[in-house]
Amino acid sequence: MLKFDNLILASSSEQRLSLLEQIGVIPGQVVSPDIDEVVLKKELPKVYSIRIAKEKGTKVRVLYPDKFILSADTVVCCGRRVLPKAETEEQALECIRLISGRRHRVYTTVCLYTPYNKLHCRNVMTIVKFKHLSMQEINSYIMSGQWKGKSGACSIQTSAGKFVLSINGSYSSVIGLPLYETYSILSQYFSI
């Protein structure tokens, strides 16, 4: 694994850092961008994911204009409805009930800002199908607390993985970073 001193990961997600390590990349620094992640009125999930990923990168780029800034955002949606990053048991319960027994879409956008004023963005859509969950399964998952801060109250790399019937698309994207697209962007500037 190589440490890239001029690469900053604009994220507070431990999963994204771990996924980067899977492709042999250790950023020189990790900076948690503090932005308002409110969904705009009538904003579609894909557009929201792209906007938030760009805003995260822009926020950090202002502080480090001479560095490469990697940012990402993952959104879970049912239809056109963006599900929140669950902060309360009530939010988590509502999200899990919505995706129980249904297909839902997960959009992840990855962006790389370069010191040369270039921006590379890729958006990946993955369809995930959950089994129909009993109230006992839902309550058990809620009690685990594994939903906290997770988009759509779901973290498939934890015990929620046992509820997944199928994934059509990128597994790593659902966790938080599409590895193929991230590698493709980074390899234009770094020897990975």
UniProtKB/Swiss-Prot annotation:
Coiled coil regions in record: none
Catalytic activity reported: a ribonucleoside 5'-triphosphate + H2O = a ribonucleoside 5'-phosphate + diphosphate + H(+); a 2'-deoxyribonucleoside 5'-triphosphate + H2O = a 2'-deoxyribonucleoside 5'-phosphate + diphosphate + H(+)
Subcellular location: Cytoplasm
InterPro entries reported in the protein's UniProt record: ITPase-like_fam, Maf-like
Cysteines joined through disulfide linkages: none
Gene Ontology MF terms in the entry: nucleoside triphosphate diphosphatase activity
CDD domains: Maf (cd00555)
Highest taxon listed in the record's lineage: Bacteria
Cofactor: a divalent metal cation
SUPFAM superfamilies recorded: ITPase-like (SSF52972)
Keywords attached to this entry: Cytoplasm, Hydrolase, Nucleotide metabolism
Main location: cytoplasm
A GO BP annotation: nucleotide metabolic process
Residue positions of the active site: D73
Group of enzyme by EC: hydrolase
UniProt EC number: 3.6.1.9
Cellular component aspect of the GO annotation: cytoplasm
Function: Nucleoside triphosphate pyrophosphatase. May have a dual role in cell division arrest and in preventing the incorporation of modified nucleotides into cellular nucleic acids.
Family annotation (NCBIfam families): maf, PRK14366.1
Recorded family membership: Belongs to the Maf family.
Protein's recorded name: Nucleoside triphosphate pyrophosphatase
Species assigned in the record: Ehrlichia chaffeensis (strain ATCC CRL-10679 / Arkansas)
